[in-house]
From Swiss-Prot:
Its EC number is 6.3.5.7. Belongs to the amidase family. GatA subfamily. This is Glutamyl-tRNA(Gln) amidotransferase subunit A. The lineage of its organism: Bacteria, Pseudomonadati, Verrucomicrobiota, Verrucomicrobiia, Verrucomicrobiales. Keywords: ATP-binding, Ligase, Nucleotide-binding, Protein biosynthesis. Allows the formation of correctly charged Gln-tRNA(Gln) through the transamidation of misacylated Glu-tRNA(Gln) in organisms which lack glutaminyl-tRNA synthetase. The reaction takes place in the presence of glutamine and ATP through an activated gamma-phospho-Glu-tRNA(Gln). NCBIfam families: gatA (TIGR00132). The keyword Transmembrane helix does not apply. Disulfide bonds: none annotated. Signal peptide: none annotated. GO terms for cellular component: glutamyl-tRNA(Gln) amidotransferase complex. The keyword ATP-binding applies. One of its GO terms (molecular function) is ATP binding.
Amino acid sequence: MSKIQGTLAQWRDRLRRKELSPAELVNLTADAIEADRTTNAYISFDREAALHAAAGADISSPLAGIPIAVKDNINVLGQPTRCASRLLSPYVAPYDATSIRLLKEAGGIPLGRTNMDEFAMGASGENSAYGITRNPEAPDRIPGGSSSGSAAAVASATAIAALGSDTGGSIRQPAGHCGIVGLKPTYGRVSRYGLVAFASSLDQIGPMTRTVEDAAILLQAISGHDRKDSTSANCPVPDFEAALGRDVKGLKVGIPSEYFTSGNHPGISEAVQNTVKQLESLGAELVEVNLPHADAVVAAYYIIACAEASSNLSRFDGVRYGKRAEDAAGLVELFSRTREEGFGPEVKRRIILGTYVLSSGYYDAYYSRAQKVRSLVARDFAEAFSRVDIIVGPTSPAPAPKIGDSALDHLQTYLADIYTIPANLAGLPAMSIPCGTVRESGMELPVGFQMMAPHFREDLLLKTGFALGK
């Protein structure tokens, strides 16, 4: 299979040295996408549109005309945005998301719409109307989700880098399962304008790359204040690449006992502990911290996220855009049949749950309590970060399960995000980097090492991840 090996930084250097043109790189990438018959990482790609953009690419720009894969819930002008759902199958985006506009201004070329769990609801890559995404490292395993296609594309070398979105771990968990780097920025660091919302108070767009350096380059390109997004933070964007060479000596690393438990897969525990020891050998100081509400994060998250989803997805009714049920007898039937025919089972499950917890009889019992837990989780992290610089642990408690296992135990699938959800509830930046493998059924499955930092301190994550990768 044709592959696009090498990092974003390496391809940028090659383009600037004029070893090849942006158009040639677009064709190489498109050829690799067409040759891949295994992962189903892409829903579609537009070679001609990318070649048109490549013709005017500035190789002196930060991204130098490099093609970037884009998750199918981020609007790209003139391209379909389906969110991997039948309901949006006819929709073509009439504008660029702010992250895409900034990507283009930095010299990046959107190429390919990556597969995902429908409307970003899922953690396996199996909940797509366009077929299951497979893990390139083990095709009988899931790649994780919901940014399944973005992770699989980067890991299979059919993309140099990709954009994903993260609501409860949807960048970091698939990054961990596929052995790549995935960074969820601080809530507000990257504009959400043009991202189809799942849970508006939790969603964030971020980079998925092969190296920490590439994550810094791509994050630099898409960060910044945006007046079109009321939740966008109006704060300076630091030089993320400059953070990469900084020393980690004296860095205070928080070790939460709640993340290092006997419930983790033994191989994952060993790989993560080895990475912690590596940090210590680099001069970092290990500090025990407590996150006392860690056992409540999954329940709180699913109440809040589903409540917001039930509201956000009410706009998909067959009236304004997307699929419309035919021959409906009236508006009520139009709405109900459009949604019944268009939404998949997992989306329906979450809409029902969200509507239930927002109903008058259960609002105080569930939604209000979940918001209180969210505040307590944020307070736990604030207290921990008064003593340490970063907090570390496994990205996931277990390696990638086999395809089909998730459908047998939905609760276990939800619990797989227990370590990634807290960063979304607290709005913190978090990054997953590869830290080895575990052997299962004769296969070496990737393990992710997660780091979290205080608000707007992505530089701490990047310098630490870069130091570990040397």
